[in-house]
Amino acid sequence: MRRFLVLLVVAFISIPFANGRNALNTDEMKMLQDSGGWEILSMSKNQVNGFPTQHPCFDGRPHPGQCSGVLILTKSNTFSQTVRIQGQSVKRTGTYQLNGDQLAFVDELGTQDGPYTLTLNAQTKSLILQMPQIRMELMLESEYRKMLEEQKKRDHPR
């Protein structure tokens, strides 16, 4: 009887974790793993003293030619992140693990990053990755390119 109760408790505790594994549906997973990746729009963090800071290159507005960042998540659970700031480029690669709405990275040096809480909005084609210290807002790269083209047409009509 005691063993049965232990198994019952273990099964009961495991239910939320089993359900959490499928936080994204099939279409959302396809979007998350889009081959074009995700453009980093904004990146902000809370310092230890509690004052939020915003990275000047990633302030929510496009800065083509000055800075850009793209995160690509593949179906084989690998990632690549390329950040360009004023002609300098930094690339990071590794693996990622998605467990429910938690996304964690391990880069090529074995450095662990995360887990981040993942919020994907399929309608706006946007992605938010956040944990207490940092928040990143991303847009599907193909949508970002469309947005830049539309902005260019508005700013420079023929």
Segments predicted by a language model, with ranges:
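Lipid interaction determinants
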Residues: A18-T93, Q97-R158
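Sec-dependent N-terminal signal peptides
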Residues: F4-I13
